[in-house]
Regions:
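Extracytosolic ligand-binding ectodomains
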Residues: 2-11, 21-364
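N-terminal signal peptide c-region/cleavage motif recognized by signal peptidases
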Residues: 16-20
Length: 364
């Protein structure tokens, strides 16, 4: 993998496959540009460090796929090297030849980049936050989505996990809770769960007769963690009961000491399974390269690059038209891309349990 320095931009990396024996199915060479806020021209803050980790993970994924026949030219631009960096980047003669443009991060920079992609036929990738495109014609992939989309995805996944169960939707009747409850109910109906019932949380214990005798799934639209113990107590009283947590209940830094919650499932965007030997090898390789622990952005960069590059290799530059209806489990993210009115959105979510003091990936 050759490297050359660009005078006006951050760096440009050419990733060119060398194994002729692997090149037959993937004869095309693809071009990807990372346009991210590295802050290479001044103060190196936490965001710049995060972007360097993302870039390193992205590049490591490209290198791994190079052995399988990937031919890639990877360009890297600093969108915040100075006040005019993005404009300078958008006028770079090579940028119009890109198949994918990953970034920038902020909406004010995404808007002109969206116009550029529409003009030149590139797919725009929003890697770290949701960006609503100005045009429905924009080819865009949002790897992170609004909470409303995540709520709908959780309801659909619960229906797929437990098709024969009785579903209850817990609400405290707050405005946001009722909004999420309506989303869940619509999604369950789409997934052929037609008789879900509403469970009102008032702060008091839930009576024994409030839930069916067996095979119960409770979805919480209540953000307050005070509801967790009450709902979990009710679910634990059932032989086959499951509680899907609200998306705000899990915090990656919270202690799991003396916790055992096998009937509680936490939705979480970012989770690295400590038992994943491939993730352990990635961590070791990253540390050998950078002499530092990989942050979550390194894992995110690897997962996104692997998915995008593998899609290019499999389906070509129009892969966005041939997205598989399946989960891809990376080192930290689950990716499941699906078309919507706001472009392509990632509906993939990790599902965790805390069992005997340890976080574990939930596998039904």
């Amino acid at each position: 993998m050759g490297i050359k320095i660009l005078r006006y931009f951050f760096i440009c990396i050419g990733c060119i496959a060398t194994g002729a024996a692997h090149a037959q199915p993937f004869a095309n060479e693809y071009r990807i540009a990372l346009v991210l806020p590295f802050h290479s021209g001044g103060y190196h803050g936490s965001l710049g460090e995060a972007m360097l980790d993302y870039y390193t993970g992205f590049r490591m994924a490209a290198e791994d796929l190079e052995a399988d026949g990937l031919k890639l030219q990877l360009y890297v631009f600093d969108s915040e090297k100075d006040s005019n960096a993005l404009n300078t980047t958008l006028y770079h003669p090579d940028l119009k030849t890109m198949n994918l443009i990953v970034g920038p991060v902020y909406d004010k920079e995404m808007a002109p980049t969206e116009k550029f992609c529409n003009l030149n036929g590139s797919v725009l990738i929003s890697p770290l936050k949701f960006y609503k495109p100005a045009s429905e014609e924009t080819k865009i992939i949002n790897f992170y989505v609004p909470d409303s989309v995540r709520i709908a995805s959780i309801a659909c996944k619960a229906a797929n996990f437990y098709p024969g169960y009785k579903f209850y939707l817990a609400t405290d009747n707050s405005t946001k809770s009722k909004e999420y409850l309506a989303i869940m109910k619509r999604q369950l109906t789409k997934c052929k769960i037609k008789n879900s019932k509403t469970l009102i949380y008032t702060g008091a214990a839930i009576g024994a007769n409030a839930l069916a005798k067996d095979s119960v799934v409770v979805l919480s639209s209540i953000s307050s963690t005070s509801a967790k113990d009450v709902l979990l107590t009710a679910v634990n009283a059932k032989k086959n009961g499951i509680l899907f947590a609200h998306i705000d209940w899990h915090n990656a830094s919270m202690s799991t000491f003396e916790k055992d919650e096998p009937k509680l499932i936490y939705p979480e965007s970012n989770f690295t399974n400590p038992a994943d030997s491939a993730a352990v090898r990635f961590r070791t390789a990253f540390m050998n390269r950078t002499y530092a622990e990989p942050s979550k952005y390194a894992y995110i960069g690897y997962d996104q690059a692997y998915y995008l590059c593998l899609s290019l290799m499999t389906f070509g530059k129009d892969f966005i038209l041939h997205l598989p209806d399946a989960d891809y489990r990376g080192f930290i993210n689950t990716i499941h891309l699906q078309n919507s009115k706001c472009g392509v959105q990632n509906l993939g979510i990790n599902y965790l349990q805390i069992v005997e003091d340890e976080r574990r990936e939930f596998k039904p």
